[in-house]
Amino acid sequence: YDNRNNRYTYWRLFGDAYVNLNPVKGLNIRSTFGLDYAQKYQRNFTLPYNTGFLNSDKDAVEMKQEHFTKWMWNAVATYELEIGKHRGDVMAGMELNREDDINFAAYREGFAILTPDYMYPSAGVGQSQASGGAGGFSLVSFFGKLNYSYADKYLLSFTLRRDGSSRFGSNNKYATFPSVSLGWRISQEAFMEKTKDVIDDLKIRAAWGQTGNQDIENYARYSIYESKYGTGNPPTYGTSYDITGSNGGSLLPSGFVRTQIGNDDIKWETTTQTNVGMDFSLFNQPGWLLDGVEY
C-alpha cells in the first residue's frame, strides 16, 4: 500500500521492413531495415513511517529514465545459375548494426508537501544526487558465399566474411573469417547402383571454418579516468583535496585517477572448427531411417 504511487513505465517499438527485387532471371536483391526502440521511466517515493518498533522520518523521490535504440540495415544479392550438370549460386552482401543506450537519474530529499503532484526533484530542499551515462557500439560486416555442385555428386561451398567493430582499436578493428566445405554423394556413383535397394543416400563431407566473437565491453580499449571526491557514508579516500588547507573546506578541486588501462591491441576472438562426417539413408524409406556420424 505504501508503494501505491510508485510508477514504472516501459514502452517498446520494434519491427522491420524490406524491399525485394528480381531485375533479371536468377538474380535476387533484398534490402532490410530493422528498428528496436525502448523507453523506460521509473519514479519511486520514500515516505516517513512509524510501524511498531520501526520508524523513519525520511522523505525522498527518485526518478530514472532510459532510452535504448538498436537498428540494423543489410543488403544482400544472390544469383543462381544452372547449366547442364553444373549448378551453383553466389551471394554477396553487407550489414550495418548500431546500438545506443542513454540513462539518467535524479534523487532529492526534503519536501514540504508529501504528495506525488509536488514531489519532484526540483521542489526538494535536502540532499540531492544525479547520475547518468551513455554507451553504444557499431558493427559493419561484408560477406559472400559460393555454392557449387556437379551432377548432385560433388559439392563445394565457400564462405568469406569481414567484420569491423568499434569495440576494438585501430590495430584490430577488422578481422576476416573464411570457411569451406566439401561433399561427395557416393550413392550417385555408378558403382553404387547395385546397392540402391539398401543404401538410398550416402554422402561424406568435410568442413573447416573460422568464426569471430566481439563480446567485450564497449569501451574496453580505452583508458578511463574518473574524479572521486571521497564523499559518502562512511567517507572514502578520493582524488580531491581541500584547497584552503582546512578540514571541511568548501573548495575542492578534483583530481583524476585512472580506473582502466587502454589497450589498442585487443582483438577479435577467433574460433577455428574442423568437421568430417557421413550422412546416410537406408532401405529407400525417407524419414524412416536417416542418420549420420561426424567428428
Residue ranges of model-derived segments:
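N-terminal, polar/charged subdomain of small-to-medium soluble alpha/beta proteins
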Residues: G52-F53
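Extracellular/periplasmic, surface-exposed regions of secreted and cell-surface proteins
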Residues: Y1-T46, S56-Y295
